[in-house]
UniProtKB/Swiss-Prot annotation:
Note: Present with 1460 molecules/cell in log phase SD medium.
GO molecular function term, any single one: ATP binding
Helicase C-terminal domain ranges (all copies): 406-596
Subcellular location: Nucleus, Nucleolus
Biased composition (Basic and acidic residues): 52-80
Protein name: ATP-dependent RNA helicase DBP7
Similarity field: Belongs to the DEAD box helicase family. DDX31/DBP7 subfamily.
Alphabetized InterPro entries for the sequence: DEAD/DEAH_box_helicase_dom (IPR011545), Helicase_ATP-bd (IPR014001), Helicase_C-like (IPR001650), P-loop_NTPase (IPR027417), RNA_helicase_DEAD_Q_motif (IPR014014), SPB4-like_CTE (IPR025313)
Species classification: Eukaryota, Fungi, Dikarya, Ascomycota, Saccharomycotina
Residue ranges of the motif Q motif: 144-173
Residues engaged in binding ATP: 190-197
Comp. bias intervals (Polar residues): 17-30
Catalytic activity: ATP + H2O = ADP + phosphate + H(+)
This protein's encoding gene: DPB7
Amino acid sequence: MDEDDGLLLNFAVPDVSVSSGSNKRTTSKVTGGKWKDRRKLQLSLQGRGRNQKKDRSATGKDDGKKHENDESNDSKKRPTIEPIHGPTSKMIKFSESKGEFGGKNNSYVSSLFTSNQSSSQLKVTKESDEKTYLPSNAPVEDASTFEGLGINERLSKHLTETLRFKNPTKVQKSVIPTMLSTERDLFIKAQTGSGKTLSFLLPIFHKLMMENKHKINRDSGLFAVILTPTRELATQIYGVLETLTRCYHHIVPGIVIGGEKKKSEKARIRKGVNILVGTPGRLADHMENTESLDISQLRWLILDEGDKLVELGFEETITKITNLITRNSQIMESMHKWQGLPVRRINLLCSATMQNNVEKLGSIILNNPEMISDGSSSGKHSEEVTAPDQLIQNVVVVPPKLRLVTLSAILKKISSDMSGTNNSTRTIVFFSCSDSVNFHFDVFTRGGNTFKKVKNDESGKLETVEVENDTPLIGQGTAVYKLHGSLSQQTRTSTLQAFIKDSKSNHSILFCTDVASRGLDLPNIASVIEYDPPFTIDDHLHRIGRSARVGKEGTATLFLLPGNEEGYVDGKLQVVHPKEGNLRIVNYENYLKDGFSAKSNNEDTKKKSKDPKSREGKWDIHATTWHLDIERWLLEDSGAHDKAVQAFTSHIRAYATHLSSERNYFNVKLLHLGHLAKSFGLRETPKKLGKSVESNSGIQGASKKTKKEDPRKKMLRMAKMALKSNSDEFNYS
């Protein structure tokens, strides 16, 4: 029998929707149980529970309010796709204007063409404003010849017939007669590529050849020393001397540079040299430690690229060298023997720029010098040095995220123009640091040109053999080389020679630092690209001076970032590019369109599609795909990723070393580090990259510390050593 007494109890439970929607929130005190359970129940009574959103979506009810917690949680989890209520019912994807997290290894994925700062100060140069000029450093087309300047017939014939030098340049017309007729010290200032090297080599060679009383040979002694700031420039001058000795083999040149074996250099000096080319540090070392180096008969001391010598800190070393030469000089005692040579030491200082530090070096080395500047003897020390008139200087203002694809587009365009032709061209790309050179070299040679050393069966020597002859990321028939100061001297020399002598490739590209910007006469350099801005305006002049040499045409391209860097054009470049129409502002999109506008022959793809992203041949899609391929490669290859991180951090450090006078154009605090990291193919935020660099440096530092040896292993090791010493004590075999 049911014991129901018929009593009914009614409990009034507050409605959640009503309580949440009312202005006056119902507060019910919950007691008993755990704190977490009480908190959950309290929140549910107030309509703030975690499951409220699910309940509303399940029941189809919504209070119409926007909850801050819901919005923040959704934005952190993933982008949402919401329908657009309007004339169209299409769905749009999440906007990548600020990027999004969620990539591999929790990386940050951003779009390539969004949130880019546009150029606000510079206007693109119109075609009607572009002008070209006649070469300013070309050989003089008149009746003047080398023989007419005073060079002997034998050497002049060798220059014109063998070396193909038809006429002397302006600076040669001024320097050669002065060196032949007087014995004054000279300060030579002229444009890069104007023939300064031959202007001082030819008079020295002529004087040594014309010594009649005693014929000059390797046993006669050392008569000339040429100092250069870089090993590459010393090697080049030594090569020019070797070509001159073909008409008179009795004169022997020599070279001493860092990175080579001192023992081999001492052996060559012991045999005897008449003209010695070298870098200051190695030459000073030989003067102090090589007894066979006799400098008592020295007649000429030439300092080439004097501004760079001072910049690299060789001022004290050069002073030491000159003091040693002066102390050991015996010119007065041998005047009667070498009657055709100068009766005093002649000092020459060559420089493309005139700075206070160069003038200071000249005051130390030179004695009452004569100034020769661009073909005229004048005392105008304030004269500005300018770029060659025929050089076309392009300036492209590129957003930081688009730097890498823009460089790729320029190189692709040059290679495509040269493909299928019998002509060849060379391009030099300058970077600010060696880590950046290594990274970009790996990027553009990925899956392309490879070289290996094989043993020749006949000679038994190792030879470098080319395996492939194309670079897929740039174009067929393209070879890429790299050169920087961190490479060994043997690698630097062989790389430079391979780049110069490469006749198989239609387009040869050299990625390098400023080590290749001074004095090198590289043939057929049609284009110079300054991917990273120069540290000084003088560095800019020397960089672009690799092109447009001795009257030839040339093009230089400078990359700048939007913002303060645009002021560099009016503040600095206009001074060294005074010719109207030579300095041109180019839109970076023109390069991207030329490099990434792939033409399709398919009839279906030629038809315009309603969806713009489905069009084939759209340059921005191809550029994005190219860049994403680099990013995926870095995600898959940890070694390449580490190189990219190292290149990025080294680039920032190098950027911070700009001169204080140019800091208003290149301020490291104004860089958008995130966008700049994108140009290195990195998806991590700068903060995360900084932590990874610190952790890697910490790991490297910890690995350098030697671990404490285990006592047991130490005891066993010492026991084995004692046993071995006892067994070997009477072993006389």
